[in-house]
Amino acid sequence: MMSSLSVEGMLLKSARESCLPARVNQRRNGDLRRLNHHRQSSFVRCLTPARVSRPELRSSGLTPPRAVLNPVSPPVTTAKKRVFTFGKGRSEGNRDMKSLLGGKGANLAEMSSIGLSVPPGLTISTEACEEYQQNGKSLPPGLWDEISEGLDYVQKEMSASLGDPSKPLPLSVRSGAAISMPGMMDTVLNLGLNDEVVAGLAGKSGARFAYDSYRRFLDMFGNVVMGIPHSLFDEKLEQMKAEKGIHLDTDLTAADLKDLVEKYKNVYVEAKGEKFPTDPKKQLELAVNAVFDSWDSPRANKYRSINQITGLKGTAVNIQSMVFGNMGNTSGTGVLFTRNPSTGEKKLYGEFLINAQGEDVVAGIRTPEDLGTMETCMPDAYKELVENCEILEGHYKDMMDIEFTVQENRLWMLQCRTGKRTGKGAVRIAVDMVNEWLIDTRTAIKRVETQHLDQLLHPQFEDPSAYKSHVVATGLPASPGAAVGQVCFSAEDAETWHAQGKSAILVRTETSPEDVGGMHAAAGILTARGGMTSHAAVVARGWGKCCVSGCADIRVNDDMKIFTIGDRVIKEGDWLSLNGTTGEVILGKQLLAPPAMSNDLEIFMSWADQARRLKVMANADTPNDALTARNNGAQGIGLCRTEHMFFASDERIKAVRKMIMAVTPEQRKVALDLLLPYQRSDFEGIFRAMDGLPVTIRLLDPPLHEFLPEGDLEHIVNELAVDTGMSADEIYSKIENLSEVNPMLGFRGCRLGISYPELTEMQVRAIFQAAVSMTNQGVTVIPEIMVPLVGTPQELRHQISVIRGVAANVFAEMGVTLEYKVGTMIEIPRAALIAEEIGKEADFFSFGTNDLTQMTFGYSRDDVGKFLQIYLAQGILQHDPFEVIDQKGVGQLIKMATEKGRAANPNLKVGICGEHGGEPSSVAFFDGVGLDYVSCSPFRVPIARLAAAQVIV
């Protein structure tokens, strides 16, 4: 092949070598064996326009090649191609083809292309999966022929054949969607074995290895393809170990394993009424079908729902020649991250098992050893692994999750993908990689997910030293953070308890992908088996869920719903605390403390703030809330709900009730005079906390009945009689007058202030007295008064008149004049429709998206739970509209009102103050329609800041 390139091949030698990765060039002289098969593919890539342009070649004095490429690698048209091969330094795909090849397939192709040792294989595309689903869950026409053609390539590369006892070719069959879904879809290893093939394999590689591989295949194929519970195979294994008096699988002899194979084959007959299929080609077809089927499995669907993964065509299928980590003490398998996924520390973080296969580590079947043990027992393979990690991290410019196998001291790379990480890890990795000049700040902003920040805002233990006497066990610190909850033993119970508002600690011997719903619902996860890279650990870290894994001291009894630690018994419902940072298991409920911003997070958030256009405010009702908001980076208060201040003490609520029960304006004014100093004091505290930043104060909004006592009517009357000094008859009459059929659409918002102007007057007087008082103390106060529930311009005009009159009086009395704004909440659809009229009166609009959603859909927030889950399950709604803004309906009202309002008033400030202001996809929409700010709860402020930046980058 190379001779056909002759002259141009010699001329382009320097260009070819310059295209090799830097680390590969460094290793060239020391490892020619690994580079020989790499050179041809590197040569082809160097001639590809995407890699080296023609102008670059001309500038070097070299002539661009022409038809010379055809003998090396024929052009590939991917329009209808469904099977792509890779391995031995060449591939038909690359990392940019994730949507077609899935993440695993695209990265296998890429690793092959950059010269790493990847076992040859083929990838069946995600489009083929989509066709499979559309074809009644059967392989579409022609696909099997394409698979067979790809298999021929693998057989030629490996000089072996599927099903040939003299030259056996065991295969792995793995799933791989475009977005990583750890453990959610299926894998089959050692495919192609039967009695004849395993005998041939035994002759070549030893009987113990061959029959160990065979029993693993029978177990995995039976579970994944035939639907036989793994526990039925595990029972046979545990029974045999008990009979032999051994504890480890590795202590079983070849004869033991051969006997175990027969027991496993009997499981097929007992469980399914049919024998294990011995035809390797049939095994492959069934395995491909099973992987395609796993795309639509309940656990995969639930994982996609939890993580809001949509728009994917399906999973790819990766069929790859097997390499074996279970061929004795010179073999092994491992999983690693190029940096610590929990902390972000720049240090290899992983685990390794000698004489084992990959699923033993990933599935948590055996608790592995630290990666450092590999350096001692396999130094050459370890050195090469470290070099490969440097190559991959430099190539992808990200922290990578890598699976590898060592077969008789030779390293093979089985998978690489962008590594899942905790919030803490994500931020540190992003900051470090910017400092290392690997990425720029805009890339860093894209690398950290909003969910990562959510994790960082979770509490930690208040005083770890205080609970040391209650630590009963220590496992592996698989996912950091603190969790406190009641012990439960099934995923179903965890989901049920979560729905009931209970905090659950899910305790399992080991988690499986079927547990994904319960893992998401639980406050924390504790497992007896599994390492730092087990299913439980990887999934928990991705969600920021506290997890302690591999806690060997605990014994879990699911049937009795208990677990034991020595003589101690912990029952279902007992309180337990977990420290995912240290791995400690602690009895009882331990106190939690709010989180604090790290230096890395402050640096990262400063980049986000520089990038974003949208301002981020906070909804805060007390001075403490305001201080928290400011510490979290809020640029002001977008919603201060005055009514929340009324519940701060018994004296305040009693004064409110006197105001509500008042019969005459004079009585009402007496009660309001009692409330004024309370409101003024709170406003002073908020203005002080927000020195130099705007504070938007909403006038009283909720229906008055919300301030009355709860309980039966007699209790309410008695309590009000004590609070107000009124007679029972007077109170009964007043309560009857306050009663409403639909209070949320009744006597509330600006309707209160118009009916009782003295109510608006009291609140506004308190606001401006506090503003002037703080100004006199050197605080810069920027007050904004918001009138709620406006549906007509006349309503707003009325309240503005009252507000401006009170402001003028206060300024005259106190001798100070301040600038201020008066605006309104747009929460009634009619207000959005006539926004140009309202905009003429207002200084600002703030969309109250909670009520606007309620009134636009006609859904009562208090009752929507009765049918919302049904709507979501049936696809009638894609999201809860009270969490994610409805862009087609409510969103269009917001867009229209913004445009109309600004047409009437070009200086109109526009924002939103519903909880949608902290939801990332909603923030992106608000930025797109040109709002000036969003306002959300104090703890969601960093999330909104990042979401607003990610829209820009």
Curated annotation (Swiss-Prot):
Disordered, as annotated region: 55-74
Query: Quick one: a GO biological-process term for this protein?
Result: photosynthesis
Q: Which residues carry this modification: Phosphothreonine?
A: 533
Extra facts = The reaction takes place in three steps, mediated by a phosphocarrier histidine residue located on the surface of the central domain. The two first partial reactions are catalyzed at an active site located on the N-terminal domain, and the third partial reaction is catalyzed at an active site located on the C-terminal domain. For catalytic turnover, the central domain swivels from the concave surface of the N-terminal domain to that of the C-terminal domain.
Q: Name one GO molecular function term.
A: ATP binding
Designated name of the protein: Pyruvate, phosphate dikinase, chloroplastic
Q: Where does the record say this protein resides?
A: Plastid, Chloroplast
Q: Where is the transit peptide?
A: 1-77
Keyword Metal-binding appears in the UniProt entry = yes
Per UniProt, the keywords (alphabetical) are: ATP-binding, Chloroplast, Kinase, Magnesium, Metal-binding, Nucleotide-binding, Phosphoprotein, Photosynthesis, Plastid, Transferase, Transit peptide
PTM summary from the entry reads: Phosphorylation of Thr-533 in the dark inactivates the enzyme. Dephosphorylation upon light stimulation reactivates the enzyme.
Q: What is known of its domains?
A: The N-terminal domain contains the ATP/Pi binding site, the central domain the pyrophosphate/phosphate carrier histidine, and the C-terminal domain the pyruvate binding site. The C-terminal domain (829-953) is involved in cold sensitivity.
Q: Which cysteines are joined by disulfide bonds?
A: none
Q: Per the record, what is the consequence of mutating residue 873 to S?
A: 10% activity in the cold. 60% activity in the cold
Per the similarity annotation, which family is this?
Answer: Belongs to the PEP-utilizing enzyme family.
Chain sites annotated for binding Mg(2+): 827, 851
InterPro entries given in the database record: ATP_grasp_subdomain_1, PEP-util_enz_mobile_dom, PEP_util_AS, PEP_util_C, PEP_util_CS, Phosphohistidine_dom_sf, PPDK_AMP/ATP-bd, Pyruvate_phosphate_dikinase
- Which Pfam families does the entry link to? PEP-utilizers (PF00391), PEP-utilizers_C (PF02896), PPDK_N (PF01326)
Question: Mind naming one GO cellular-component term on file for this protein?
Answer: chloroplast
Q: What is the effect of changing residue 952 to V?
A: 25% activity in the cold. 65% activity in the cold
Q: How is its activity regulated?
A: Activated by light-induced dephosphorylation. Inhibited by dark-induced phosphorylation. Both reactions are catalyzed by PDRP1. Inactivated by cold due to the dissociation of the homotetramer.
Q: What is its EC number?
A: 2.7.9.1
